[in-house]
Amino acid sequence: MSFMMALANSTMFTTSGIYHVTSLGLNPFELVLMGTVLELTVLIFEGITGVVADTYSRRISVIIGMFILGSGFTMEGSVLWLTGAGSIISVFAWIVFSQILFGIGWTFVSGANTAWVVDEVGEEQAGAILMRSQRLSLTASLLGIGCSVGLSMITPNLPYLIGGMLYAMLGVLLLIVMKETKFKRQEHAPQASHFKRMTGTWLSGAKVVRKHPLLGVIIAVTLFSGAAYEGYDRLWQPFLISGIGLPDLKVSMAVWFGVVSAAATLLGLGGVRLAEKWIDMKNERKVSAAMLLLTMIRVAAILSLAVAPNFAWAIVSVLIAGASVSISEPVYGTWLNMNLESKTRATVLSMVSQSDALGQTAGGPVVGWIGSRFSIRASILSAGILMLPVLAVFGRIIRKRI
């Protein structure tokens, strides 16, 4: 599952900046606003779908999500054709529709997939499994980068069409092979309505957050990290294109971004492999220390990109930021699951995701406005500053564990 999702995502997103900027003509504010629409959708639906996964089935939730994601990405790839002669709906409106489908589909998968893995293999093995899954995902990303560059050179929207098809195929495959053997539904009154069952599950998840103060702090801090990384993730490609400028070589933009993404993925693969050897994924304090270090590296890389005077400096900053994200994802997932109960795992993970979505929804437009009002460089600088509170939180967590 992780391999196929990473392959589809890499195929679509490696050259997404070229498609959105050069083919669809979106400006910095619209680029961030489309992300805001996505995250607002996640904010609205994440709690509902997380409760569905904990109340009924993680497997069903994941499969539904795959088909919705496939539909959303196919729509996004079809915008060039949907806005042809005679169309009364604008390019940006179609992008908004596709982002809404993307958001709804992702909420069905988010939380449910990790909860399913942890329940099936057990908490003690989950950290190692998530690390191996990340390595497989990064390997798939390398394949997707090549596909994205090749498809984009044929026509810029083709990567999204192929990515949507891959998600639909994955949904069919999971219907056949995905099993759910360890999931236990929460007990409810026999005559309880679906709404009462889902409300009971959500309240149980909220109790878990209240009982773990540090988990509540993490949820609050994701507001800042969500706002920060939304701006960075949407704007680093346009920044290289118009803010720094690509080298004057006989190489297309698709190839440039393919090379950058491949290099970042290779760095991430090496970093994940080292993390598997050096980090005791069963030791919560060591996992927290690793998160502090990785967050420091990411913040430094984003700030470095904001002040980059030339292309070489900017590329090194982008590579370091990308590699730090690749390594931190499984480490962060492991840390969260160390503090969660099985019966409400998907619900609490969805709450964390909602907090991230709220941060992106509230802060993303501000970062985008800064880019339109002043410069993209100023947007990226503000994104780095917004991530600084995260460092204080992980430092506090480590002190609590000593």
Where are these regions (language model features)?
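C-terminal transmembrane bundle of multi-pass solute transporters/carriers
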Residues: M1, V32-V37, L43-I44, I48-T49, ...
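Helix-loop boundary and gating motifs at the non-cytosolic
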Residues: M1-L43, L214-S261
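Hydrophobic core of transmembrane alpha-helices in multi-pass small-molecule transporters
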Residues: F3, G72, G86-V109, A312-I327
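C-terminal ends and interior cores of transmembrane alpha-helices
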Residues: F67-I89, M296-P309
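Cytoplasmic helix-loop-helix junction between adjacent transmembrane helices
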Residues: S98-L138
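Glycine-rich segments within core transmembrane alpha-helices of 12-TM secondary carriers
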Residues: L130-V149, S355-G363
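Helix-loop junctions on the cytosolic side of multi-pass membrane transporters
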Residues: G163, Y167-Q191, R396-I402
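Juxtamembrane intracellular "pre-TM" segments in multi-pass secondary transporters
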Residues: K179-I219
